[in-house]
Amino acid sequence: QGEVYRRYDPRIRRMLSFRIADPVSDAERFTRWMNDPRVEYFWEQSGSLEVQIAYLERQLTSKHAFPLIGCFDDRPFSYFEIYWAAEDRIGRHYSWQPFDRGLHLLVGETQWRGAHYVQSWLRGVTHYLLLNEPRTQRTVLEPRIDNQRLFRHLEPAGYRTIKEFDFPHKRSRMVMADRHHFFTEVGL
C-alpha cells in the first residue's frame, strides 16, 4: 500500500507520484472517471459506485496486476493498471519475454490531459515499471486503434508500434518500449 514512485518534473514544474489505489478513498473519484464519456468510450466499464469498488478490490487481489493512482502535486489525475504481460490476455498476441510489463491507463481529470502532461506521466510510469522490476526489459501497451490522441505521444516517450491485432472487444495497436532505448535515448 501507499506511494510507490515520486519525482519532480522540471519541464512542467510538478511533482509526479504514483500510489496504490484504495477502493475506499478512491471509489467516488474512480467511479466519476469510469463514467466520463471519453473514458467510458475506451474502457467500456461504466457503472455504479459498487461496481467500481468491486473492480478495484479485484485488481488489488490479482496475482498478475495492480492498480495505481497517478498524482500531480499530490492531486489524483489518472489510473494505471500494471500487469505481467505473459499472464494477461496480451500474452497470446506476441512473443513475450519473462518480466515484460503491461500498462492500461486513463486520465480522469481533464485539466491534466494536455500534451506536456502526457510526456511527464507516460515517461514517469515507464520509468517506474523499469525501476520496479530490474529484470523487465520491455513495457507494452495495447490501446484501441482509434485512440489517436494517445498514439501521437507514444513515440516521443520511447514506444514503437509492433503490430495491430484484434481482441474480442476491440481492435488494438501493440506498442512497446525497450529498457535500453528508454534509458539511453528517451529518458525522463
Q: What is the predicted function of each stretch?
A:
Residues 131-143:
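Conserved GNAT acetyl-CoA-binding A-motif
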